From Swiss-Prot:
The gene is cpiA. It is found in: Cytoplasm. Belongs to the cystatin family. PANTHER family: CYSTATIN 14A, TANDEM DUPLICATE 1-RELATED, CYSTATIN FAMILY MEMBER. GO terms for cellular component: cytosol; phagocytic vesicle; vesicle. This is Cystatin-A1. The record marks 5 as: Reactive site. InterPro entries: Cystatin_dom (IPR000010), Cystatin_sf (IPR046350), Prot_inh_cystat_CS (IPR018073), Prot_inh_stefin (IPR001713). Keywords: Cytoplasm, Protease inhibitor, Thiol protease inhibitor. It comes from Dictyostelium discoideum. Intracellular thiol proteinase inhibitor. Inhibits papain, but not cathepsin B. GO terms for biological process: adenylate cyclase-activating G protein-coupled cAMP receptor signaling pathway; regulation of proteolysis; response to bacterium.
Length: 94
């Protein structure tokens, strides 16, 4: 595996990503001011750990979340982007 750039492949949400979102659900809900988040699709970036760029569905629409998993397997929400995100929006680095 190479370190660095965001991988171009978009993957449908799977059990691994649902678990990642579940681990940070409260933080995501707070940052997005919502009561529900459901992962839809994602991309990854290998760094000193893994960045997950996840498209999530909320009652208000869609958002992108950047979740970091460090080498000790701790998860945290790095950032979220909701403005202008639609179901068709490409997942890009932010």
């Amino acid at each position: 595996m190479t370190l660095g750039g965001l991988k171009p492949e978009v993957h449908a949400a799977n059990d691994e990503i649902r678990q990642v979102v579940a681990k940070v659900a409260d933080e995501l809900k707070s940052k997005l001011n919502t009561t529900e988040v459901e992962p839809v699709s994602y991309k990854t970036q290998l760094v000193a750990g893994t960045n997950y760029f996840i498209k999530v569905k909320t009652p208000a629409g869609f958002a992108h979340a950047r979740v970091y998993k460090d080498l000790q397997q701790n998860h945290s929400v790095h950032s979220v982007k909701a403005d202008g995100i639609t179901e068709e929006s490409e997942i890009v680095y932010f």
